[in-house]
Amino acid sequence: MTRFANRTRELHLFEQMLRGQVRERILLIEAPSGYGKTGLMGRFEILCSQKIHPVLIDLKGAQAGIAFVFSRIQRVLGKKRFPNFNAQIDRFLNSGVEIQNNRLTGEGSQIQVILDVPPEERKYRLTQLQQVFFEDLERFDRPIVFILDTYNGATEELAGWIESQFLAEVALNPKLFAIVAGQIIPQPTIEWQNLHHRCKLDRIMEREAWYGYVKDVGFDCFSSQEIDVLIDAVEGVPARVVALLEGAARTRQQI
């Protein structure tokens, strides 16, 4: 499990969302590299109880774009649980879409082929697929949390779709939640602006938070004064503080 010096506010807000104690169901996490976004996404997954389906997607690896997201969600939740979506895919495939064997490799390949058409036809097909996909999600008996990491690494089309279409669909279904993290984050649209909360991860300068972290990870070789020096040296940037602590701990073990 990833240990944190201090992300109490974000974790508490996430738990409130899942319990229905706040109105928001969309959480945007913005921070530069090294501030612990990815580790926080993993912690969000752990906080999901057995009554909630978490779906983690790293958007920087989604080179197939929208097709990858559809396919990834299906793989995590179970392809058979999307009967309407699968039927719509079959209808498109049986309507004359040309499929070459060497193109049917990788996640989302069939969906990619279906969407590999001129813009107007692509828009129509995507609308049809999106509609039945979210209709299938409405039939799930448990809430679903989509955890989308590295939004800044998404293709331009995928980022725009998440911002304008995906999150709008999430807003319509009270059993759906979405966490989107990145160095940049989606801009709220009228469909979901009243259902989102934005968190900007800051540097962690709180001494007590780092003292607790050092104790949790077993770095008993540091005094509080030494920890203070390391925090100030890198101005509380979490990844850099951790790197200094780990490096100093290894050096002391070798002495």
Set out the residue ranges of the language-model regions:
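Conserved Walker B catalytic segment
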Residues: 26, 119-182, 193-194
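Conserved phosphate-binding/catalytic loops and adjacent sensor/switch elements of nucleotide-binding enzymes
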Residues: 40-42, 46-141
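Walker A/P-loop nucleotide-binding motif
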Residues: 23-42
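Conserved AAA+ ATPase "SRH/arginine-finger" region at the nucleotide-binding site
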Residues: 197-208
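Short regulatory helix/loop adjacent to the ATP-binding pocket of P-loop NTPases
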Residues: 183-199
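Short, conserved phosphate/pyrophosphate- and ester-handling motifs at nucleotide-, phospho-/glycolipid
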Residues: 7, 38, 237
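Amphipathic alpha-helical "lid/sensor" segments that cap RecA-like P-loop NTPase cores
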Residues: 197, 215, 219-255
